[in-house]
């Protein structure tokens, strides 16, 4: 499947923010659209960058004192801001189940719980890496089959 095929299914709308936008604007956009990154544009919607949740966390970490003095929320317990209804999986969950749940739920991390105890966490990156490995193995097996047939 090509990127074009994926875009034809999901659409080509891209959430953007002008380079002069404020960090607070970006945070609002990420929240409103439930996305992990916003594309930053310049004149005539030209791509100039991308701002991700990780970029924001890195910025806060590098400027902790500035953020702490400017943001009274920084001294509040994380419990007040966390997601409380956490989707989880078990060690017996399949990769396909995980992919579907992550896609439908629009989240990138699934804690792995067995008998009420946290035993790990699976990220979308873990799933992608696994699928790429599977696809490579399948490709090699098919190639070998064709060569020996």
Predicted regions and their residues:
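Tandem CBS (Bateman) regulatory domains
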Residues: 1-12, 52-88, 94-103, 124-149
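A glycine-centered beta-loop-beta connector
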Residues: 30-33, 38-55, 102, 110-125
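The conserved cystathionine-beta-synthase
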Residues: 16-35, 40-41, 88-106, 113
């Amino acid at each position: 499947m090509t990127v074009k095929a994926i875009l034809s299914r999901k659409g080509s709308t891209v959430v953007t923010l002008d380079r002069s936008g404020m960090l607070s604007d970006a945070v609002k956009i990420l929240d409103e659209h439930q996305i992990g990154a916003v594309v930053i544009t310049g004149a005539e919607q030209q791509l100039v960058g991308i701002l991700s949740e990780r970029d924001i966390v890195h910025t806060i970490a590098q400027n902790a004192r500035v953020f702490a003095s400017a943001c009274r929320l920084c001294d509040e317990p994380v419990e007040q801001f966390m997601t409380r209804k956490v989707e989880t999986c078990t060690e017996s969950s399949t990769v396909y189940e995980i992919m579907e749940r992550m896609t439908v739920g629009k989240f990138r991390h699934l804690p792995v719980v067995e008998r009420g105890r946290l035993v790990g966490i699976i990220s979308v990156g873990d799933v992608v890496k696994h699928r790429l490995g599977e696809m490579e193995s399948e490709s090699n097996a098919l190639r070998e089959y064709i060569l020996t047939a």
